[in-house]
Amino acid sequence: MKKIGFFIMNIGSAGGTERVSINVANALAKQGYDVSFISIGGNKPFFQVDEKINIYAMNKLPYSLKKDYFSITKKLRELVKELQLDTLIVVDGAIMLFSALALVNLNIKHILWEHYSFNFTGNRLVRTLGKYLAVTTCDKIVTLTEAEKTLWQEKFKTNNIISIANPNTLLPKNKLAKLENKTILSVGHLFSYKGFDYLLKVWQVLAKKYPDWNLKIVGSGEEEENLKNLAKALDIEDSVNFIPRTNDVSFYYESSSIYCLPSQTEGLPLVVIEAMAFGLPIVAFNCSPGVKQLVEHKENGFLCEQNNIEEMVKGLDLLINNPELYLQMSDKSRLMSEDYGIEKIIEEWKGIL
């Protein structure tokens, strides 16, 4: 069977990119593929990895391109040759800088799996260079949505791009979300681009009107202290629960009522797909083509103008006050989530390996 390698920034991170990469790798391993992870940082995965999958960690995070570029590239090349890989899947365009050189003159299929939106501005220079390297060196570029695929094609005039959605493997076992839980949920790294400061300002308006409701934010990150201080300054700390990153996110989906996504940028957010599977209506900022694909306005939730606090308040308020509307949107979320089942998505991956 084919030997597949996933080259990833940090296998130990608890983000959606890591979770979905592990989900796909696990599914391939279960179907007989010989799968390995090569990680620049971390050697202990946060999410469960199939026992048949090998993990090779360089322990190079944080790295400096000036100091570490050639050592990381050299190590990657050595591992690719040692493992006799047929295909290397690069998870995130920011690390294309290493794989583009590491695979020179090696007869290996080279695939970029881009999880970030085409217009994401973080680490701009590295990501721009990564795009050009992907177009010139990769056999395939995988985007998460058709809209992102179109953006790549319009910019680079290339036909080696395919869209494959993120698959969901997290399904409800016992119970679904319900309005009576009186909980608004948001899950993600506590980073500035996740927009949790906007969510707290939204909640400040709603908390006064619905004192028996609460907001749960599940995740860890560098903005945690700032967000807790903001909650205190907004006088909402008693109704906001900050919960550290966890493997048992299912518990929070099934015990909540509405999922809220205040992000400034996203790819195709796995947390939204998972929330939909548990019957959570979604209220989100329209921050990317991926979010627009998942949230059909007034069907399974509300798509709000970017950073428009008033619109987000209105969407949440409508769901809280209308049990019939809530049930309609909850059912629609569950139905739409079925398009992202792992069985369907993994066949698309097998088609390009």
UniProtKB/Swiss-Prot annotation:
The keyword Zinc does not apply. One of its GO terms (biological process) is carbohydrate derivative metabolic process. Its EC number is 2.4.-.-. GO terms for cellular component: membrane. One of its GO terms (molecular function) is glycosyltransferase activity. Keywords: Glycosyltransferase, Membrane, Transferase, Transmembrane, Transmembrane helix. It is found in: Membrane. It holds the Pfam family Glycos_transf_1. It is a single-pass membrane protein. The chain crosses the membrane at residues 267-287. Belongs to the glycosyltransferase group 1 family. Glycosyltransferase 4 subfamily. PANTHER family: GLYCOSYLTRANSFERASE, TEICHURONIC ACID BIOSYNTHESIS GLYCOSYLTRANSFERASE TUAH-RELATED. This is Uncharacterized glycosyltransferase HI_1698. The lineage of its organism: Bacteria, Pseudomonadati, Pseudomonadota, Gammaproteobacteria, Pasteurellales.
